[in-house]
Amino acid sequence: MKLLKDLLVDRKEFEDWKNNLTWARDGTLYLTTFPDISIGQPKYAKDINCNSKNLFHVKEFPLEFENKLDFELAQQNGLLNSQPVCYPRVCKPSPIDDWMAVLSNNGNVSVFKDNKMLTNLDSKGNLSSRTYHCFEWNPIESSIVVGNEDGELQFFSIRKNSENTPEFYFESSIRLSDAGSKDWVTHIVWYEDVLVAALSNNSVFSMTVSASSHQPVSRMIQNASRRKITDLKIVDYKVVLTCPGYVHKIDLKNYSISSLKTGSLENFHIIPLNHEKESTILLMSNKTSYKVLLEDELHVTADNIIAPYLEKKFKKWSTIWNEFNNYETTLVIHGISLSPDGYSIAIVYDMERVAFKYKIASEQSFNIMFAPLYHTWTISERAVGLAWYQTYQIYNQSLPKLPENFSMNKKLLNGNYPISLDFQSYLNALMKSEEMRIIMFLNMTIDKPSILSFLEALYEYAINKKSELTNSFDLACVLSIAAILKREAPIYNGTLLMKNSFLEETFNLESFTADPETVTSTTNNTWKRCGVTLLPILTTHVKICPVSKQRVIDIKRDDLNDYGWFTRGLLERFNEISVYCGTTLEVM
């Protein structure tokens, strides 16, 4: 496939970490540039001209950190005494929520929503137990685990208060190293209900973490070693780790170990190929890459997925900047991240001469390459909104695999609506359905986005609860939906009084059945409709969908109108996410 033109990151500087790039579920790229994080904010364009700059807008994303150890004097880790300024080492967005956790250089793990800090994780204990060097999100529930300098895993759970704000609290801890040992926890990976951690003495532990296991029991699956672990992943219940000269596989079913000599002392990145029929990974370093099949024994083949693209880019660069081969040149990889759905890969790299040269940040320029890992792709629940659109463009605008005879008017959940649920749970069930995910994606590829299937599901719920529809805003909404679907409406009589900061307008309920795009008041003024509730938009407090351009009333700022349970529920559920395509709504 033809690749998109690389995304450029100019006038920035990376620290010497290998986890400098993360791809979030909404399509945002997080880059741990110094001193402030940079992001590749996803954006929508109908025609991107095969250029990734039309999919991402690179900008600085400054965060304010707290240092809980600011006035502590470290006895064992003297580096903490000499690093008063906080800067990011690792960024990881939550796989199920819109939060991001950041590990700083001085042992803090902070959680942010947008650029607002929610918490700086902390627990009781001595300094070493409160100093963190790695963390991982729970892939299933809202919780997070951190590893400290005492060889201990600390689990923090999350609950939401009455204002729907998350509160993080220390729940439990598991000690991996022996008492009195000073081995740090350096790696944590969490796959479904399996958690694997490695210590600074290169021993590896595994445990099963689930709702039923209140106190997980750890098991050592690799003894301490003098070879430093450089990367650690879980692939199909197999632990894969790399160290200088070797790659090891530990089967979690029988704890058998297979090893393979790589023939290179390079630090390898492990790239799981989760959508292959057999357990397969790519091993990638600055100089070489391999494809490894994780059977009983490890089988190595040439990398025919990423290597050809990188070799082509390296030859092109050498033709321009090292035409006569006067210099030794190398490709330096600063970070690798799978797309949230696992179908694509992003690699941040640069080409450089092997020579002593002083560079300042304003001279730096890095490239981010996007490449497909397979020939086809499907719409995944692990991604949302523009992340699907990015995969679509990376695969040269090839459509994903769709169910047979699928249409935009297909009933959600095959028409088996869970009417017995409360309204918010019902909306969540609709949005999580496979049909709704496909509709939201297809809305990004057509000229006139449609949510008729979603309106059909809303109508069925409203008719089932019609005895509870007494509010005029709710009645107007249901009347509008019935008119669009050409279905029977519960009531036609009555009026609706709607307000904004400057005026009031009265509407006959009958007027909501005339035009699906606009509503005319009794004073003969015509108003555009809200994209979710189909109510007239009088207020300036609205948000807009970047794809469909539909406007939605911002319920958090519009406090003048007495919305009912139906319309208020819709506006609260879709206050941040577009029902048309799953993208983040933009504030106007």
Curated annotation (Swiss-Prot):
Gene Ontology CC entries for this record: nucleus; transcription factor TFIIIC complex
Annotated site residues (Involved in the interaction with TFC6) in this chain: 358
InterPro entries given in the database record: TFIIIC_Znf, WD40/YVTN_repeat-like_dom_sf, WD40_repeat_dom_sf
Keyword presence, Metal-binding: no
Domain of life: Eukaryota
GO biological process, one term: transcription by RNA polymerase III
Compartments, as annotated in UniProt: Nucleus
Pfam family for this entry, one: zf-TFIIIC
Function: TFIIIC mediates tRNA and 5S RNA gene activation by binding to intragenic promoter elements. Upstream of the transcription start site, TFIIIC assembles the initiation complex TFIIIB-TFIIIC-tDNA, which is sufficient for RNA polymerase III recruitment and function. Part of the tauB domain of TFIIIC that binds boxB DNA promoter sites of tRNA and similar genes. Plays a role in TFIIB assembly through its interaction with SPT15/TBP. Essential for cell viability.
Other observations noted: Present with 2070 molecules/cell in log phase SD medium.
Name of the molecule in the record: Transcription factor tau 60 kDa subunit
Organism of origin: Saccharomyces cerevisiae (strain ATCC 204508 / S288c)
Gene: TFC8
